[in-house]
UniProtKB/Swiss-Prot annotation:
SUPFAM superfamilies xrefs: Ribulose-phoshate binding barrel
Functional summary from the UniProt entry: Catalyzes the condensation of ribulose 5-phosphate with formaldehyde to form 3-hexulose 6-phosphate.
PANTHER family according to UniProt: 3-KETO-L-GULONATE-6-PHOSPHATE DECARBOXYLASE SGBH-RELATED (PTHR35039:SF3)
Organism expressing this protein natively: Staphylococcus epidermidis (strain ATCC 12228 / FDA PCI 1200)
Gene Ontology BP, a term: 'de novo' pyrimidine nucleobase biosynthetic process
InterPro entries from the UniProt entry: 3-hexulose-6-phosphate_synth (IPR017553), Aldolase_TIM (IPR013785), HPS/KGPDC (IPR041710), OMPdeCOase_dom (IPR001754), RibuloseP-bd_barrel (IPR011060)
Protein name: 3-hexulose-6-phosphate synthase
Domain of life: Bacteria
A GO molecular-function descriptor: hexulose-6-phosphate synthase activity
EC number: 4.1.2.43
Pfam families (alphabetical): OMPdecase
Family listed: Belongs to the HPS/KGPDC family. HPS subfamily.
UniProt keyword annotations, A-Z: Carbohydrate metabolism, Lyase, One-carbon metabolism
Entry keyword annotation includes Lyase: yes
Length: 210
């Protein structure tokens, strides 16, 4: 089981500093969509140049022109790139092919997918490396959790890894870990904590079952 830190609301310099502080506890560091919108792919490059061991994920949430956008993210140092599960099959397949051509991985974000079970099966067959159930900010505000979606997707896929994101914090991560996902994505639960290093450590301890 891997742990990913999602950084959304900082600039690229702040993001790199946070990543450096917690890198020993996380496997992947994400440059979130808001940072990409504000600062572009150089933010991905800046992170890549300032951390040592963790992989870098570029949360582009690709919808179209998938092979080109994946290639650009990879050029700037991304190890993993995201595409939306609601994208066309042709886009998903092109993104998978482009990522794999460079030895990189594709994460498919299931945010706003209506038929999770059917789409997860299709994406699994298309070669997605990760399928991520994602309760976004707007649904978190309504009290929604990704647990049920995680169970649904885990029950139907055969090859892809399952990731889970959405409001996960050190005090709630054990419920997620109990469902045995392959990747747990924590954003504000670490980034906005009074002590991000301690929060990251608590999350690492939880996923290692200690």
């Amino acid at each position: 089981m891997e742990l990913q830190l999602a950084i959304d609301l900082l600039n690229k310099e702040e993001a790199a500093k946070l990543a450096q502080k917690v890198e020993e506890y996380v496997d992947i560091v994400e440059i979130g969509t808001p940072i990409v919108i504000n600062e572009g792919l150089p933010a991905v490059q800046h992170l890549n140049e300032n951390i040592n061991n963790a992989k870098v994920l570029a949360d582009l949430k690709i919808m179209d022109a998938a092979d080109y956008e994946v290639s650009q993210a990879v050029k700037y140092g991304a190890d993993i790139v995201t595409i939306l599960g609601v994208a066309e099959d042709a886009s998903i397949k092109a993104a998978v092919e482009e990522a794999h051509k460079h030895g990189k991985a594709l994460l498919v974000d299931m945010i706003a997918v209506q038929n999770l079970e059917q789409r997860a099966k299709e994406l699994d067959e298309m070669g997605a490396d990760y399928i991520a159930v994602h309760t976004g900010y707007d649904l978190q505000a309504e009290g929604k959790s990704p647990l049920d979606s995680l169970r649904t997707v885990k029950s139907v896929i055969k090859n892809s890894k399952v990731a889970v994101a959405g409001g996960i914090k050190p005090d709630t991560i054990k419920d997620i870990v109990a469902e045995d996902p392959d990747l747990v994505i924590v954003g504000g639960g670490i980034a906005n904590a009074d002590d991000p290093v301690e929060a990251a450590k608590q999350c690492r301890v939880a996923i290692e079952g200690k």
